[in-house]
Curated annotation (Swiss-Prot):
This is Leucine-, isoleucine-, valine-, threonine-, and alanine-binding protein. The gene is braC. It comes from the Bacteria. One of its GO terms (biological process) is L-alanine transport. NCBIfam families: PRK15404.1 (NF011933). Residues 1-26 form the signal peptide. It is found in: Periplasm. Keywords: Amino-acid transport, Disulfide bond, Periplasm, Signal, Transport. CDD domains: PBP1_ABC_LIVBP-like (cd06342).
Length: 373
């Protein structure tokens, strides 16, 4: 994690002791809850979400706000824990907040959506990719990221085309996000007529995967796909290298975090990952990227600009609706497209983006990435 992100983590964690933190620029405000992990093993993804959302709030307010009102960001910590996410969602409702950017993890997002939909709160997640989140006919739930059933086939087709002669294992962390995307990858690979030699789950939070790695070695595995997050992937990479497992590793956007390099060290070199397009490299975003850098913040984090876009969409939706009524804003979101740093975004009836691309990148030990052509 870069120094700017580390400072953000400490700041947000300190604020979370009180339950939430508020960023306000005027008495007449529209509150937006920023719900995600301030603490816990994947707090780095919450840092990305908050950095992007708070930058959008700051810039919108400097430009005059929304329909004469200023935006206010209110931080809530769910630690990416489903039970804590339910408590956060109830607090958001009790605090009278009508808009949410979050949650971050799919497993914590889904139970929170039930509360938001019932209580008339509009939510946009910049990071939760499980298809089930938007599959229940809800009208107030949206996302500015693609789905596992978009991302999984991208990885599966890549594996089938480039590693069809290798012995393949597909692993997952037994959680909604990780197991869901691993299942999509397995299905895509097998639909191409290629056998998956090992399909197995591990326990998120475990630290020792040597028994599993020994099993992979005995099976002659040469390529490993892991559905899950960077803490487990980093340990898998490091322990596989130490055990002499000669295999290429690949994962979803949940592994694309600079912290994985701190965990895996040189073993992170060459890891493959499906990630959103590198929006920070788009020339049209140069002024925005410079604004992040002026704050010593890293705009390349995979959820930074999707979170910025989520706030942008809420603000423009309120302008289109003419008022900060979540139901009317939801109608405006489905009826329009919105120019954002992550493209011109339009939403379908489910609240999903009509278009979103995942790209295969190669990870490097200095925490940079290169698109695989």
């Amino acid at each position: 994690m870069k120094k700017g992100t580390q400072r953000l983590s400490r700041l947000f964690a300190a604020m979370a002791i009180a339950g939430f933190a508020s960023y306000s620029m005027a008495a007449d405000t529209i509150k937006i809850a920023l719900a995600g992990p301030v603490t816990g093993p994947v707090a780095q993804y919450g840092d990305m979400q908050r950095a992007g959302a708070l930058m959008a709030i700051e810039q919108i307010n400097k430009a005059g706000g929304v329909n004469g009102a200023q935006l206010e960001g209110v931080i809530y910590d769910d630690a990416c824990d489903p039970k804590q996410a339910v408590a956060v969602a109830n607090k958001v409702v009790n605090d009278g907040v009508k808009f949410v950017v979050g949650h971050v993890c799919s497993s914590s997002t889904q139970p929170a959506t039930d509360i938001y939909e019932d209580e008339g709160v509009l939510m946009i997640t910049p990071s939760a990719t499980a298809p089930e989140i938007t599959s229940r006919g809800y009208k107030l739930i949206f996302r500015t990221i693609g789905l596992d059933n978009m991302q999984g086939p991208v990885a599966g087709k890549f594996i089938a085309e480039r590693y069809k002669d290798k012995t393949i294992a597909v692993l997952h962390d037994k959680q909604q996000y990780g197991e869901g995307i691993a299942t999509e990858v397995k299905k895509t690979v097998e639909d191409a007529g290629i056998k998956v030699a090992v399909f197995e789950g591990l326990n998120a939070g475990d630290k020792d995967f040597n028994a599993l790695i020994s099993k992979l070695k005995k099976a002659g595995v040469q390529f490993v796909y892991f559905g899950g997050y960077h803490p487990e992937m980093g340990l898998l990479l490091r322990q596989a290298k130490q055990a002499g497992l000669d295999a290429r590793f690949m994962g979803p956007e949940g592994v694309g975090n600079s912290e994985i390099t701190a965990i895996a060290g040189d073993a992170s070199e060459g890891m493959l990952a499906t990630l959103p397009r590198a929006f920070e490299q788009d020339p049209k975003n140069k002024a925005l990227i410079d604004a992040f850098k002026a704050k010593n913040q890293d705009p390349s984090g995979i959820f930074v600009l999707p979170a910025y876009s989520a706030v942008t969409v809420i603000a423009k939706g309120i302008e289109k609706a003419g008022e900060a009524d979540p139901e009317k804003v939801a109608e405006a979101l489905r009826a329009n497209t919105f120019e954002t740093p992550t493209g011109n975004l339009g939403f379908d009836e489910k609240g999903d983006l009509k278009n979103f691309d995942f790209t295969v990148y190669e990870w490097h030990k200095d925490a940079t990435r290169t698109e695989v052509k």
